[in-house]
Regions:
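Conserved AMP-binding
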Residues: 106-110, 130, 263-269
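A short helix-loop-beta submotif of the ANL/AMP-binding
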Residues: 88, 109-134, 145-154, 258-259, ...
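AMP-dependent adenylate-forming
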Residues: 15-29, 44-76, 217
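Short beta-strand elements of ligand-binding domains
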Residues: 106, 175-185
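Conserved pre-ATP/AMP-binding loop-to-beta segment of ANL
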Residues: 53-56, 180, 186-221, 227-228, ...
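Conserved ATP-dependent adenylate/AMP-binding module captured primarily in the ANL superfamily
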Residues: 133-168, 199-201, 242-261
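Conserved AMP-binding/adenylate-forming core of the ANL superfamily
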Residues: 33, 57-117, 134-142, 192-200, ...
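Conserved AMP-binding/adenylation subdomain of ANL enzymes
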Residues: 240-259, 266-286
Length: 286
């Protein structure tokens, strides 16, 4: 029987200070202060695209026509930054903002990731809607609720075949639909590649610099287990501060860039904030 291999890990925060409040409330505070953190998550993307441009940020196995898995498709930090700038310009050209954000109707995917960072660069909030609301639901009630709540200016879906029915049922004709693959009969759509082909201008840099700690990065919706899902605003400060908390609690993240095999859905805070953010913040690979 082989001996299990263990890796020694250093934990940064192991103790807390507690004080008694009123009405039985107790307050706990880590025994070390929170250090300075990035102003915006895109600062980290720029940092890694500059310091290690060829390192893999994202990777996915290509699915062959017969359903088997082929080679890995890699996207480096430099490529992600270039793609994010192009997408950001496309979003700026469309006048999207917090009142007209981006809704993503797709599972975790490379295009989903690139669109997300493009939104961050442009300062346009995005929302990853639970794929189940589009692929399992028969009445699309929760999807309609998300669209009504956010009033998006653009909706993205990776696959027309998988998401076409939900788009036809819930997405208004006045909302631009961007598809990575396929077409929807009788409806004009925009290919995702056209966003990637948009030439970036100085407006992209200006838009990113205009974002700050209180800029809305994304909307996450609660699970809707008992009632309709509720939109939760996630600001740049919230996301960056949380990543710094994680970095101080788990110093190993700064010692070795994390490599994650990820399946947790990005419409949930664990997958979309914890894991995706951890990789981006520390120059890892997802």
């Amino acid at each position: 029987m082989s001996t299990p291999k263990f890796r020694p890990l250093k934990f940064g925060v192991t103790r807390v200070n507690m004080r008694e409040g009123t009405s039985g409330v107790r307050y706990m505070l880590a025994d070390q202060p929170l250090e300075d953190f990035a102003t915006r998550m895109t600062d980290r993307l720029v940092h890694w695209a500059t310091t290690k441009p060829d390192a893999t940020m994202l990777a996915k196995r290509v699915k062959n026509a017969d359903g088997s898995l082929g080679d890995w498709r890699h996207i480096s930090y430099a490529q992600a930054w270039q793609s994010a700038r192009a997408i950001a310009q496309a979003l700026i050209d469309r006048g999207l903002n917090a009142e007209r954000p981006v809704v993503i109707m797709s599972e975790n995917d490379l295009e989903h990731a690139l669109l997300s960072v493009g939104c961050l660069v442009a300062g346009v909030p995005f929302c990853a809607a639970s794929p189940a609301y589009s692929t399992i639901s028969q009445d699309f009630e929760k999807l309609r609720h998300i669209l009504t709540t956010l009033t998006p200016g653009l909706v993205f879906a990776a696959d027309a075949k998988r998401y076409g029915k939900a788009i036809e049922a819930a997405v208004g004709k006045d909302i631009e639909v961007v598809l990575h693959s396929g077409e929807i009969t009788g409806r004009a759509t925009t290919p995702f590649e056209s966003l990637l082909a948009t030439p970036a201008t100085p407006a992209v840099d200006a838009a990113m610099q205009a974002t700050g700690p209180d800029t809305i990065a994304k909307f996450l919706f609660t699970s809707g287990s008992t009632k309709l899902p509720k939109a939760v605003i996630n600001t740049q400060r919230m996301w960056c501060a949380n990543q710094q908390q994680m970095a101080q609690s788990m110093p190993v993240l700064a010692e070795t860039p994390p490599v994650l095999v990820d399946w947790l859905p990005w419409n949930h805070t664990f997958g979309g904030n914890h894991n995706f953010g951890m990789v981006l913040y520390h120059g890892g690979t997802l």
